[in-house]
């Protein structure tokens, strides 16, 4: 697909991150049972609604998060129950149409960055619980975020009617989702509430999910959501159910993987708050998804590498502060990475700084996630532990590395500790650097 076509389509998909606040008569009840509110809150957490609908430093669900696209900035809207600035005048029917059909109260179409394609699979009972909680459990916030204003053709919502006819919506589930058996509950969580396929399933020319490649991996605003099918070489077929549960609960498994970027955010705001029963249901379902192979990966990502006894590259000579010459990847690693990850790449003894070998990021068949981690850093709180790694992009407070330096250190790390030299280039880093602003 030509880049310009993909950019335009992604702009269209990115534009509709929320429900619109439109005048109407309020029709929701003045109160709701406590158990219904508790269920609605849990479902909203599982759906990770707060991620897109809360600006940095802003109040929960008040909108205002800006996402840069080639066609302009997308701004998420207020979905608190404020009657004038949020969705306080939505009836339950209005809410259901927005949530499951992507249709606003005025009849216009939402853009599918609001994952109604997945939420269409929600049961009637869960939609009712979500509505009750958003109307009675969320604090109203009297703030109207800036209006999203995109350039042509991304500003044409009417095009979404045609797109919806081609998209594969998740069929609605029936019955009480709380009573589903383990695999059915796991499928419900994966396909509807957690909408795993939104990130991990590749898309076709029209940016509709390719259902025959479900969870086979896909690019995502600079990051790469990896193959999480049951393939033992390209996916996570070697992971146990308990291992995947630990990852979803904490975002980290020693000697295996750690969550950063959008997945780190999903762990922090969503999966780390699920019950053990739901985590096991979700893990059990994902681990039986049919295997899909990836031409870029022929060996389990976590199987690469070993401790490296590298020679000390420090000469003892002082470096002048005005010496702006770029260092090699090995020197950059020694100066910026070795203090935490160790000269041999083994990380810290408590695994706070992870090992760089037996690591699914450095063992991947693509350098994208390593580059984005170097640029973005890691900032994740889950299971009561805050994990932080500084980024090294142009806003870094520790060291601002050039595109060439980041490419050099990424190639050094993957060659020394991971799956080999993937020939990352400064041009590739520059392109991924631009995507940082697009990451919620």
Model-identified regions with their sequence ranges:
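The feature marks the first
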Residues: 48-51, 68-121, 125, 222-226, ...
């Amino acid at each position: 697909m030509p880049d310009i076509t993909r950019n335009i389509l992604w702009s269209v998909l990115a534009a509709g991150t929320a429900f619109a606040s439109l005048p109407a008569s309020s029709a929701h009840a003045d109160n709701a049972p406590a158990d219904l509110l508790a269920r609605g809150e849990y479902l909203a957490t599982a759906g990770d609604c707060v991620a897109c609908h809360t600006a940095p430093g802003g109040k929960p669900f008040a909108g205002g998060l800006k996402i840069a696209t080639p066609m302009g900035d997308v701004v998420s809207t207020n979905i608190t129950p404020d009657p004038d600035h949020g969705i306080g005048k939505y009836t339950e029917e209005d809410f259901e149409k927005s949530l499951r059909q992507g249709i606003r109260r005025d009849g216009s179409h939402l853009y599918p960055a609001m994952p109604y394609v997945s939420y269409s699979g929600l049961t009637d009972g869960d939609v009712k619980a979500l509505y009750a909680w958003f109307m009675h459990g969320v604090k109203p916030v009297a703030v109207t975020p800036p209006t999203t204003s995109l350039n042509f053709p991304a500003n044409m919502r009417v095009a979404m009617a045609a797109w919806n006819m081609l998209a594969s919506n998740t069929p609605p589930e029936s019955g009480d989702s709380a009573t589903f058996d383990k695999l059915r509950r796991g499928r419900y969580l994966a396909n509807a509430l957690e909408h795993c396929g939104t990130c991990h399933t590749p898309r076709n020319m029209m940016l509709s999910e390719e259902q025959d490649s479900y969870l086979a991996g896909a690019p995502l605003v600079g990051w790469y959501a990896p193959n999480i099918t049951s393939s033992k070489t390209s996916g996570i077929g070697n992971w146990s159910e308990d291992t995947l549960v630990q990852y979803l609960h904490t975002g980290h498994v020693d000697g295996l993987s750690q969550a950063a970027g959008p997945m780190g955010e999903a762990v922090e705001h969503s999966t780390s708050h699920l019950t053990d029963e739901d985590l096991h249901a979700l893990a059990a379902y994902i681990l039986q998804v049919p295997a899909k192979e990836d031409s870029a990966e022929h060996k389990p990502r976590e199987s690469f590498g070993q401790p490296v006894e590298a020679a000390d590259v420090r000469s003892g000579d002082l470096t002048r502060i005005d010496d702006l010459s770029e260092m090699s990847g090995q020197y950059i690693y020694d100066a910026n990475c070795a203090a935490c990850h160790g000269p041999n790449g083994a990380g810290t003894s408590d695994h706070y700084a992870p090992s760089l070998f037996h690591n699914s990021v450095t063992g991947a068949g693509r350098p994208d996630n390593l580059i984005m981690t170097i640029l973005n850093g890691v900032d994740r709180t889950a299971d009561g532990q805050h994990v932080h790694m500084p980024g090294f992009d142009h806003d870094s407070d520790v060291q601002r590395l050039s595109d060439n330096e980041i490419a050099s250190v990424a190639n050094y790390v993957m060659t020394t500790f991971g799956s080999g030299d993937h020939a990352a280039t400064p041009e590739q880093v520059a392109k991924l650097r631009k995507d940082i602003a697009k990451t919620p």
